[in-house]
C-alpha cells in the first residue's frame, strides 16, 4: 500500500502502475478468507502438539489473543494446564493491570527496559513453556522473539496484552491499533514483491517484456533475459555478475570489479550506488573511513526460511478450517495457504479439489531464553549459521512431519499428497531495526546506519539497510536519496 509512503516512493509506485485504483482492484481480487494478507476477519488458527496429532483450533485466533468474542471458551479448549488457561484468560481479557503498583513513570521505564517474555513470566505468571504461544505472531512480523524485544516494542509490533497495562496500556493501544490497521492494508501479489521488481525492470527496459500492460499481467508475463544487457538500451542490467571491489580513482571515476562466469572484469562509471547488504560494503570498498565501515558493519540481518509445498489437492487443508495457522512449537511457526490472489494474470486454485501450495515460515531465532551474554545481533548471527548448516533433507523431514501431524487427521498423507517442496533459505533477510534491550539511543545522524550511508565521493549507499527499516518503501527512499546525492 502507498499509505504512509513518502512522495518519492508514492511517485515510483504510480510510475509502475501501482496507484490507488490498482491497489483497490487488488483488494477486490484477494480472497476474503485469506488471513496471510492481514485480513483479521478471515479464519485463522493455532496448532499445538498433542499426544498424537496436533490440536487444531480454527476460528479467529488473532481475535482470541486480543480478548475477542468467545476468547474464554477458546482458551479453555487448549491442551494446556488449567492454571495456564486461567492466566491467559486474565491477560487477554484486559480487565486487570499487570503493572499495578508501579507509578506512571515506573511503568514507562518497565515497558522500555524489560523483555516481553520476561514480563509474561514475571508479571503475568506464565510458565516458560507457555510463552511461545504468544511469540508466534512476533516471530512472523519481526523475525525476532519476545526475548529480543521490550514489552513496548512487542506490543507496538502486534503482540497481545496492550489492554492489560491499566491506563498506560489503553492510552498506548491507539498506536498498536494503528499498527494493526496497517496490517489490514497489506496487498500481496501471488509472487510477493517479485512482481514489483519485475515492473521496475520492465519500465526501465521495455523490450524485456513488450506485452506487459503494467501490473495487470505482470505475474504471468515471460521475460526475455537476453534483452536485459543490450548496448542499445538506455538501462542495462547484467546478471550473474558478482561485484568484488569498488573504488573511486584519481581520474574522478568509479571502478567496479566483478566476476562473471569465473572471469574477472571491470566496468568504469561516473557514479556508483551500492544498494547491497551493508555488511558487505566495507569489504567491497575498503578505502572508506573506519567509522563509516564500522557503521555499515553494525547491523545484522534477520534470517528466515520460507518453504512452499505443492500438494495434490487442498482437501485436507480445507477441512482444517482456516487459511493460516500459528504453530508456536513447530520448526515452521506459520503455515498458510499461498496467496490466493487473482491479479497480474495469475489464476489461483479456488476449490478443495484443486492443487494447492502451502506456504510455511521458519525463524531460527531461539524460542527459549537465550544466553544473557548474547546480544540480539549475536543471536541473529547464530541463527544465520544454523540456516547455513541445515541441509534440504533436514527441512524436508521437518515439513513432512509437521504437515502430517497437523493435517493427517483430515486425511492428509505426506508420502502421496506432497508433489514438490521448495525451500528458500534467507540468511540475510530483514534489515536490522535496533532493539532497546541492546542498542543505545543515538543522537540524530549518529546511528550506525546513518554514519554508514554517508556519501563517499562518487559512491552513495542505498538499500533498506541504510534506513534501518525492513520495508520496500524504505528501499525506495534510500534509492531516491542516493540518486539525489550523485546528481546534486
Where do the protein language model's features map onto the residues?
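Conserved beta-strand->loop/alpha-helix structural units within folded catalytic cores of enzymes
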Residues: 3-12, 18-24, 112-116, 122-127, ...
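Mid-domain catalytic core of redox enzymes
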Residues: 231, 235, 239-369
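Conserved flavin/dinucleotide-binding core of flavoenzymes
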Residues: 49-51, 259, 310, 316-488
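N-terminal glycine-rich phosphate/pyrophosphate-binding loop and immediately adjacent elements
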Residues: 1-109
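Charged, often glycine-rich, active-site loop that binds/positions anionic groups
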Residues: 36-54, 224-233, 239-247, 255-257, ...
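Short, solvent-exposed loop/turn and secondary-structure capping segments
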Residues: 133, 148-153, 167-170, 283-287, ...
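Active-site rim elements
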Residues: 1-3, 102-110, 182-191, 292-298, ...
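Active-site/ligand-binding neighborhood in enzyme catalytic cores
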Residues: 83-241
Amino acid at each position: 500500500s502507498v499509505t504512509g509512503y513518502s512522495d518519492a516512493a508514492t511517485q515510483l509506485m504510480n510510475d509502475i502502475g501501482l496507484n490507488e485504483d490498482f491497489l483497490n482492484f487488488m483488494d477486490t481480487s484477494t480472497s476474503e478468507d485469506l488471513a496471510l494478507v492481514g485480513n483479521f476477519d478471515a479464519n485463522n488458527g493455532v496448532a499445538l502438539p498433542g499426544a498424537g496429532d496436533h490440536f487444531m483450533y480454527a476460528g479467529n485466533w488473532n481475535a482470541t489473543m486480543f480478548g475477542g468474542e468467545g476468547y474464554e471458551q477458546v482458551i479453555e479448549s487448549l491442551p494446556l494446564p488449567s492454571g495456564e488457561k486461567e492466566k491467559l484468560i486474565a491477560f487477554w481479557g484486559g480487565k486487570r493491570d499487570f503493572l499495578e503498583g508501579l507509578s506512571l513513570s515506573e511503568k514507562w521505564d518497565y515497558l522500555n527496559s524489560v523483555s516481553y517474555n520476561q514480563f509474561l513470566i514475571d508479571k503475568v505468571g506464565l510458565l516458560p513453556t507457555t510463552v511461545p504461544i504468544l511469540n508466534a505472531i512476533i516471530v512472523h512480523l519481526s523475525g525476532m522473539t519476545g526475548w529480543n524485544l521490550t514489552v513496548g516494542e512487542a506490543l507496538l509490533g502486534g503482540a497481545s496484552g496492550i489492554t492489560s497495562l491499566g491506563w498506560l496500556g489503553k492510552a498506548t493501544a491507539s498506536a498498536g491499533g494503528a499498527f494493526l490497521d496497517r496490517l489490514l492494508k497489506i496487498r500481496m501479489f501471488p509472487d510477493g514483491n517479485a512482481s514489483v521488481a519485475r515492473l521496475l525492470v520492465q519500465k526501465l527496459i521495455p523490450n524485456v517484456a513488450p506485452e506487459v500492460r503494467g501490473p495487470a499481467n505482470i505475474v504471468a508475463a515471460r521475460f526475455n533475459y537476453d534483452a536485459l544487457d543490450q548496448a542499445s538500451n538506455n538501462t542495462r542490467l547484467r546478471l550473474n555478475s558478482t561485484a568484488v571491489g569498488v573504488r573511486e580513482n584519481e581520474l574522478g571515476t568509479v571502478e567496479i570489479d566483478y566476476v562473471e562466469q569465473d572471469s574477472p572484469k571491470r566496468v568504469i562509471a561516473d557514479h556508483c550506488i551500492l544498494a547491497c547488504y551493508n555488511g558487505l560494503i566495507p569489504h567491497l570498498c575498503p578505502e572508506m573511513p573506519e567509522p563509516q565501515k564500522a557503521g555499515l558493519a553494525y547491523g545484522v540481518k534477520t534470517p528466515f526460511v520460507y518453504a512452499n509445498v505443492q500438494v495434490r489437492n487442498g482437501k485436507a487443508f480445507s477441512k482444517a478450517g482456516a487459511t493460516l495457522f500459528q504453530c508456536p512449537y513447530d520448526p515452521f511457526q506459520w503455515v498458510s495457504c499461498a496467496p490466493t490472489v487473482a491479479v497480474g494474470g495469475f489464476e489461483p486454485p479456488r476449490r478443495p479439489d484443486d492443487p494447492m501450495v502451502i506456504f510455511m515460515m521458519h525463524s531460527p531465532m531461539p524460542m527459549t531464553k537465550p544466553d544473557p551474554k548474547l546480544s540480539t545481533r549475536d543471536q541473529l548471527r547464530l541463527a544465520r549459521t544454523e540456516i547455513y548448516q541445515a541441509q534440504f533433507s533436514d527441512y524436508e523431514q521437518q515439513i513432512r512431519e509437521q504437515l502430517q501431524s497437523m493435517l493427517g487427521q483430515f486425511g492428509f498423507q505426506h508420502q502421496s499428497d506432497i508433489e514438490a517442496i521448495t525451500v528458500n533459505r534467507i540468511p540475510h533477510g530483514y534489515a536490522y531495526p535496533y532493539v532497546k534491550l541492546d542498542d543505545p539511543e543515538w543522537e540524530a545522524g549518529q546511528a550506525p546506519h546513518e554514519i554508514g550511508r554517508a556519501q563517499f565521493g562518487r559512491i552513495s549507499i542505498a538499500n533498506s539497510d541504510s534506513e534501518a527499516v525492513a520495508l520496500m518503501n524504505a528501499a525506495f527512499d534510500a534509492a531516491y536519496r542516493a540518486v539525489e546525492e550523485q546528481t546534486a
